[in-house]
């Protein structure tokens, strides 16, 4: 059976149980109201501000959680932007495409922001944000490459799985060409091996639109 993943091997940080990366106990936020104090974990509190975190590898459980959060926020307000912060080494192609399809389907604009590393499927999701609203922090890193996979079994079974991973490769390359404006043959060439970019290089490539510069005290967004 094929394991078609677009996974960055340097960052092997899989946390399938949560759509966020949170080592140790979750930080909590206490809010005071007329009904007394209420405690929220920090990510639930940020979800109320329409902020979602993808800080882990991408698998089916993570995809289900992100899709559910996007659908919930769309139902809450179909006109207000959804922000997705991405620090991910990549993961399952099919799970990533489930997240991607939902990003394209929901009515609100989906803002994508890279912090840390957006590699492989993480970079693909970063590029799939709303045009003009794909951002990266100054010291983030972005990496694109082709899907990784392997198969075993009888020759015919291996042939079937090989055709599937080639189909996924062509699908991802075509979508990335649409989002970046790069020719399909350049995408195919660049993703043949790991291809790392700085935020400024990612702007030139078309993977993102702007680099966030907070040196002025406030969150200032500057053209790359």
Swiss-Prot record:
Q: Where are the transmembrane segments?
A: none
Q: Which UniProt keywords apply?
A: Cytoplasm, Hydrolase, Protease, Serine protease
Active site feature? 120, 145
Give the residues annotated as coiled coil: none
Entry keyword annotation includes RNA-binding: no
One GO MF annotation is: ATPase binding
**GO CC terms on record?**
cytoplasm; endopeptidase Clp complex
Q: Which SUPFAM superfamilies match?
A: ClpP/crotonase (SSF52096)
Q: Which GO terms describe its biological process?
A: protein quality control for misfolded or incompletely synthesized proteins
Give compartment(s): Cytoplasm
Give the EC number. 3.4.21.92
Q: Which InterPro entries match?
A: ClpP, ClpP/crotonase-like_dom_sf, ClpP/TepA, ClpP_His_AS
* Catalytic reaction annotation: Hydrolysis of proteins to small peptides in the presence of ATP and magnesium. alpha-casein is the usual test substrate. In the absence of ATP, only oligopeptides shorter than five residues are hydrolyzed (such as succinyl-Leu-Tyr-|-NHMec, and Leu-Tyr-Leu-|-Tyr-Trp, in which cleavage of the -Tyr-|-Leu- and -Tyr-|-Trp bonds also occurs)
Q: What class of enzyme is it?
A: hydrolase
Record text on subunit structure and interactions: Fourteen ClpP subunits assemble into 2 heptameric rings which stack back to back to give a disk-like structure with a central cavity, resembling the structure of eukaryotic proteasomes.
Q: Which family does it belong to?
A: Belongs to the peptidase S14 family.
Q: Give the function comment from the record.
A: Cleaves peptides in various proteins in a process that requires ATP hydrolysis. Has a chymotrypsin-like activity. Plays a major role in the degradation of misfolded proteins.
Please give the name of this protein: ATP-dependent Clp protease proteolytic subunit 1
What is the species listed in this Swiss-Prot or TrEMBL entry?
Parasynechococcus marenigrum (strain WH8102)
